[in-house]
Amino acid sequence: VAFLALAGYALDRAFLETAESNLRTRLESYALEYTRRIEFLRDGSLYVPDTPPEPRFERPGSGLYAEVILPNGHWDSPSAQGPELPMGAMLAPAVQRFEGPLRITRSNGEAGEIYRYGRGLVWAENGPQAEFPYTVYISEDTSALSQQILVFRRALWGYLGGAGLV
């Protein structure tokens, strides 16, 4: 029985680490897609195309949020309208950060949590004298990840409990 408990714990940790790693990879790919799509106009203002990499970025409170931090302001995806999200800090160029769970207040006033991936970048299209830093953050509500973990844990402990009875 002790072996089954240890095996169950190890499988649970491995699943959790894999699920978080997959989430990080997905958030990173959205950040890279936004980085590829956004542009800065001659006056330095940010231009974000109307079509996001994922439709959920357009729906307020969808659970998937994009934010671009600039030296003189920031931009949020339409999905960020409603929930109170923690403000991201400007990251140094080439710095990546994956953090969470971070507390938020959802659009309906309930407490929630997000995971957030950020990447620090530099815009230098007009030469080194005109370059400036910016940071792209992508955040996702923990609800989907929590549900996956719950389903896995129920199945895991159900099967291991059954094996222990045998």
Residue ranges of model-derived segments:
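Juxtamembrane segments flanking the first transmembrane helix
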Residues: 1-72, 147-150
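Alpha-helical transmembrane segments of integral membrane proteins
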Residues: 3-8, 12, 156-166
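Surface-exposed loop/turn and secondary-structure junction residues enriched for glycine/proline
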Residues: 7, 41, 49-51, 60, ...
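General N-terminal targeting signals
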Residues: 32, 44, 51, 63, ...
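Short, surface-exposed, polar/charged, turn-prone segments marking secondary-structure boundaries
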Residues: 32, 55, 93-97, 106-107, ...
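Short linear functional motifs in flexible/disordered or boundary regions
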Residues: 39, 43-46, 78, 128, ...
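Extracytoplasmic
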Residues: 74, 79-157
